[in-house]
Regions:
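Nucleotide-activated sugar donor-binding and catalytic core shared by glycosyltransferases
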Residues: 1-242, 246-374
């Protein structure tokens, strides 16, 4: 067949879509025959790909930061059967020219999208120009949303069997829907807690909290750190500030005056190690972060979800028994104390039961089969 060209299209809106793409690439490269494959990951929303896409991303992120309720309105409109198709088609039409340039550059034998924007644009380009490359879509949340619903996609990868069944009820071919789980990189899947704590630089044997706000450092981390000062028991607190340099600086300054042992890092690839070192993760409910916590058997305390997808993710993780959802008005310190004192063992078991550690490998296997059938 010669060298097979696989194109993975992602979007740097948060870090979850990109992390899922990297997990797929890692799993594909680990398979037999990987030497005969060229695997490219392209950020569809980067400045280098399209200045228009990049500006759309900046508007989106500004909306999330300053007017999240407006995003909630958009999410709900795009999620309706009547209006979702129109929203999806509008984005696909605007982005189709850029998609054509990418397709001509990479000449893919298979395209995988980890975000609905490139998914819709690739599907529209394929129809308009008579292309025949297989197209797969990876949904990166624990609930369905109509903006993903493109009937011309050859394979869907979803997080749960319930999502697959729901798509089938909506008229999608069940044979094309694969409940693989959400792909993650398993760089620390068998790391013992003691070894992880050594790698994380934790010198004291203390109950350990991991604080994350997503790859963009969103979430009120300052308020979280202030609230944790009300926990009387001394803690080790691992703070991951993401790409938010200002937040990282403020967290370091606050840590100098805390009665807890505070360790601060910016964007890091060592999150799996930190998860294995921690007893509890305090975070916004991004689906990739939740999936990584499940794989580490790490209980979660969830707060401040982005209206829409993160709210659905919080519902799922809480329903699984692996998470506690801190709603507005509820105090963080008592919740942390209660979890540490009474619920960790049960929540750890629930997290492990929810884990789909082989998701990336299963996705890679199915993609390889699609290439072989081409």
């Amino acid at each position: 067949m010669g060298e097979a060209r696989i194109l993975i299209l992602t979007a740097s809106i948060g870090s979850g879509h990109t992390r899922a793409a990297e997990a797929i690439r890692t799993a594909l490269k680990a398979r037999p025959g990987a030497a005969e494959q060229q695997i490219d990951v392209v950020d569809f929303m980067s400045r280098e790909v399209s200045i228009i896409h990049y500006l759309m991303k900046r508007i989106y992120l500004t909306m999330l930061r300053f007017v999240p309720n407006l995003y909630d309105v958009f999410f709900r409109i795009a999620g309706k059967k009547t209006s979702g198709g129109a929203v999806r088609a509008a984005f696909a039409w605007v982005m189709m020219r850029t998609m054509g340039r990418i397709i001509r550059t990479y000449q893919p034998d298979l395209v995988v999208a980890t975000h609905p924007f490139p998914e819709g644009a690739a599907a529209l380009w394929r129809i308009r120009h008579g292309e025949h490359f297989p197209l797969a879509a990876l949904l990166t949340d624990y609930a369905l949303h109509a903006i993903w619903f493109v009937h011309d996609v050859d394979a869907y990868f979803v997080a749960t069997e319930e999502m697959a069944d729901e798509m089938a009820m909506l008229g999608f071919d069940r044979r094309r829907i694969h409940a693989t789980g959400i792909p993650i990189v398993l760089s620390a899947s068998r790391l013992a807690r003691r070894e992880a704590r050594v790698q994380a630089g934790i010198s004291e044997e203390l109950p350990t909290l991991l604080l994350m706000g997503g790859g963009l450092g969103l979430g009120d981390m300052d308020a979280t750190l202030a609230a944790l000062e009300q926990v009387e028991q001394r803690l080790a607190i691992l703070v991951v500030a993401g790409r938010n340099a200002s937040l990282e600086e403020r967290a370091r300054a606050r840590g100098k005056h805390s009665h807890h042992a505070v360790y601060v890092s910016g964007y890091t690839h060592d999150v799996p190690v930190l998860m294995h070192a921690a007893d509890l993760l305090i975070t916004k409910p991004g689906a990739l972060t939740i999936s990584e916590a499940f794989a580490a058997g790490l209980p979660l305390l969830l707060h401040d979800p982005i209206p829409g997808p993160e709210t659905e993710n919080a519902v799922y993780a809480t329903r699984c028994g692996a998470a506690v959802w801190l709603h507005p008005g509820e105090r963080m310190a008592p919740a942390v104390e209660d979890i540490l004192a009474h619920h960790l063992p049960v929540m750890r078991r629930a997290a492990r039961n929810c884990a789909r550690e082989e998701a990336a490998q299963r996705v890679a296997e199915i993609l390889t089969e699609m290439l072989q059938r081409k």
